[in-house]
């Protein structure tokens, strides 16, 4: 099945005092650091855009073009997952900004985030993921991302799709 869709994304980002690269923090320790942090006001972003849904019996893929709002204009994003493992979601960006981020609850993944200026090593730790894209048309990911040498951020990403 292939069809055009409407995509609604809500994203909230918080700065946190944690290092994912050290590999020393377990999930309980990370959650305690996050909960006890006195973070400044979160940064919120809402995006409404058009995209494409491609789904077969093996995988589901949602694609859309990034906008000026995200600061990644000129890039395209594809979010996909294997239907046998809906708890692992991959987000690939190509264009001005490119990366492949893997989200899997309780897991830490290292990735490269390429910008027009230079590539950065990124570590992503997924706290929670609720993937209902094939049913209710929603995807919620709660994760921490850290660019090596920079402050970590917790992001709560929520996507809703409709026809």
Q: Which residue ranges define each predicted feature?
A:
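A short, structured loop/turn motif at beta-sheet edges
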Residues: 53-57, 82-85, 114-117, 134, ...
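Acidic, glycine-rich flexible loop segments
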Residues: 92-137
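Generic short beta-strand segments
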Residues: 8-17, 65-67, 125, 142-144
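Mixed-charge, glycine-accented linear interaction segment located at domain edges/termini
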Residues: 130-163
């Amino acid at each position: 099945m292939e069809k055009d869709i409407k995509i609604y994304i809500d994203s909230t980002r918080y700065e946190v005092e944690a290092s994912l690269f050290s590999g020393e923090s377990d999930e309980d320790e990370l959650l305690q650091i996050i909960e006890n942090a006195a973070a400044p006001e979160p940064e919120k972003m809402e995006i409404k855009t058009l995209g494409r849904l491609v789904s077969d019996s093996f995988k589901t893929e949602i694609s859309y073009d990034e906008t000026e709002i995200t600061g990644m204009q000129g890039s395209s994003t594809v979010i996909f997952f294997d239907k046998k493992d809906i708890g692992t979601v991959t987000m690939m960006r190509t264009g001005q900004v490119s990366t492949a981020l893997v989200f899997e609850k309780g897991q830490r993944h290292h990735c490269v985030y390429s910008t027009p200026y230079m590539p950065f090593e990124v570590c992503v730790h997924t706290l929670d993921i609720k993937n209902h894209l094939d049913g209710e048309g929603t995807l919620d990911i709660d994760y921490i991302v850290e660019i090596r040498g920079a402050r970590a951020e917790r992001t709560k990403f929520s996507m809703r799709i409709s026809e």
